[in-house]
């Protein structure tokens, strides 16, 4: 069994996980669903030990994950099956750069026309405020958009 108690995680001033507590029974299939930007990917990465929560504990069969050795953590991860939402983003480019890239590669539009299209798309998918951020700095749901 996996037990999550009072899990919190923030990135800068943005609180992503706010006191999550739940349990997952061994052998059961569980779904983690929610709105875009609600912290699903961050939560799963905490479960896998890929991100360290700011507060709270994650226990596997009564053993606190953060107190386990690297080998034990690896073995636990191998027992879990995860399906992540995929994205084809360039980590070295900002959100704006990722949207601009196909236009630069496959259109003959002027720079200002391309920028107008990028601005339009970012507004449509509610990512204007994230335009200068890199994929690692935004939620999985935002990456999907």
Regions found by a protein language model. Give the residues of each.
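ABC ATPase NBD coupling module
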Residues: 65-81, 105, 111
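Short coil-to-helix segment of the ABC ATPase nucleotide-binding domain corresponding to the Q-loop/switch region
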Residues: 92-101
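Conserved ABC transporter NBD signature motif
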Residues: 56-65
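The feature captures the beta-strand-to-loop junction immediately N-terminal to the Walker
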Residues: 33-35
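Conserved ABC ATPase signature
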Residues: 134-138, 142
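Conserved ABC ATPase "signature" region
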Residues: 63-64, 111-130
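Helix-to-loop junction immediately C-terminal to a conserved catalytic motif
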Residues: 48
